[in-house]
From Swiss-Prot:
Signal peptide: none
Protein name in UniProt: Large ribosomal subunit protein uL11
Annotated gene: rplK
Keywords attached to this entry: Methylation, Ribonucleoprotein, Ribosomal protein, RNA-binding, rRNA-binding
Gene Ontology cellular-component terms listed: cytosolic large ribosomal subunit
Domain of life: Bacteria
Post-translational modification: One or more lysine residues are methylated.
UniProt GO MF annotations: large ribosomal subunit rRNA binding; structural constituent of ribosome
PANTHER family for the chain: 60S RIBOSOMAL PROTEIN L12, LARGE RIBOSOMAL SUBUNIT PROTEIN UL11M
Family: Belongs to the universal ribosomal protein uL11 family.
Coiled coil: none
Length: 143
């Protein structure tokens, strides 16, 4: 028989830097989950990633105080800002441009994000990434 699910917890945690302090500790503590067990498992799974890169994670909490978690790909905005070498997007995205990325960079980001996107093929995923970049004030050359 399947375990009874008591809830889902969605967090964004920097890769390799999960610790019991907020937001991780309170979110897991109120469901009665073992915080250190999650932190060790999360840090072990993200040790191959770039340290500090925010990783969305969905934790499934069960009634017997056990849990499982699924890691998603880093947010597209973070990957776009890294590719464009900017700290933040434009406050007026359609008038002030803060940087640009090439189509090749957009394709690389789309390949990374493909498991989490609803796009049917790579070209549709590239257009999705290009739209996100435009809404941040970053131009995409060749799209």
């Amino acid at each position: 028989m399947a375990k009874k699910i008591i809830g889902f917890i969605k967090l964004q945690i920097p890769a390799g830097k999960a610790n019991p302090s907020p937001p991780v500790g309170p979110a897991l503590g109120q469901r009665g989950l073992n915080i250190m067990e999650f932190c060790k498992a999360f840090n072990a799974q993200t040790q191959g990633m770039e340290p500090g890169l925010p990783v969305p994670v969905v934790i499934t909490a069960f009634a017997d105080k056990s849990f499982t978690f699924v890691m998603k790909t880093p947010p597209a905005t973070v990957l776009i800002k890294k590719a464009a070498k900017v700290d933040k997007g434009s406050s007026k995205p359609h008038t002030d441009k803060v940087g640009s990325i090439t189509r090749a960079q957009a394709e690389e980001i789309a390949k990374t994000k493909m498991p989490d996107l609803t796009a049917a093929d790579l070209d549709a995923a590239v257009r999705t990434i290009a739209g996100s970049a435009r809404s941040m004030g970053i131009t995409v050359e060749g799209v």
